[in-house]
Swiss-Prot record:
The keyword Zinc does not apply. GO terms for molecular function: deoxyribose-phosphate aldolase activity. It comes from the Bacteria. This is Deoxyribose-phosphate aldolase. It comes from Carboxydothermus hydrogenoformans (strain ATCC BAA-161 / DSM 6008 / Z-2901).
Length: 228
């Protein structure tokens, strides 16, 4: 059985909704300190604020790039990543160009990821880059290809979902993604992880990071009504 301490260090404590306020971000950071979560995941505009709140802690600031559709230009994604790292982000979760992947334009998808990896790690080589493939929109073949491209581009993690699509992480998808990347990358499960039991299932399937807005409920052994 995985200990609750170990699970806490796998959680990206997440708040990405449009209505999040500075007070909400402050609460998120306080909870992260209380439960010793791995990171807080916030929208880019809140990165400087969260970085300031967490500057004397071990908790990282994670943010999202090209979120949630992945449909901004590569240049914009690269700038967004660079700006976020300059302002204190130590982890960036980027969304792939889903339409390009589905159209078989793999070189485009690869370059998109590469540019973000380069922009982020160019500012700070220790930055962790996670690639959101948005599994709910992909066939198994597309999921495999997306994972392969992420690894080729130098990403550290592949991530299931934004939490804003039609579905979140499933045990089957986490297994498939882990099988595909092997030891070359890690897997982050996100979307719909609302309980301690959900967390354990994802970890057993191969996830080493969990994106959830239900971190506190998970640690308290409750079931949360949160969507992400």
């Amino acid at each position: 059985m995985v200990s609750s301490t170990k699970i806490a260090q796998m959680i990206d404590h997440t708040l990405l909704k449009a209505t999040a306020t500075y007070a909400d971000i402050e609460k998120l950071c306080q909870e992260a300190k209380e439960f010793n979560f791995k990171s807080v995941c916030v929208n880019p505009a809140f990165v400087p604020f969260a970085s300031q709140l967490l500057k004397d802690s071990e908790i990282k600031v994670c943010t999202v790039i090209g979120f949630p559709l992945g449909a901004t230009s590569t240049a914009v994604k690269a700038y967004e990543a660079s700006w976020a790292v300059e302002n204190g982000a130590l982890e960036v979760d980027m969304v792939i160009n889903i339409g390009a992947l589905k159209a078989g334009r793999y070189e485009e998808v690869l370059e998109d990821i590469k540019e973000v990896v380069s922009a982020a790690k160019g500012k700070n080589p220790t930055v962790v880059v996670k690639v959101i493939i948005e599994t709910c929109y992909l066939t198994d073949e597309e999921k495999i290809k997306a994972c392969e491209l992420a690894v080729e581009a130098g990403a550290d993690f592949v991530k299931t979902s934004t939490g804003f699509g039609t579905g979140g992480a499933t045990v089957e998808d986490v297994r498939l993604m882990k099988r595909t990347v092997g030891e070359k990358a890690e897997v982050k499960a996100s979307g719909g992880i609302r309980s301690f039991a959900d967390a354990i299932k994802m970890i057993e399937a191969g996830a080493t990071r969990l994106g959830t807005s239900s971190g506190v409920s998970i640690m308290q052994g409750l079931v949360s009504g949160e969507d992400y």
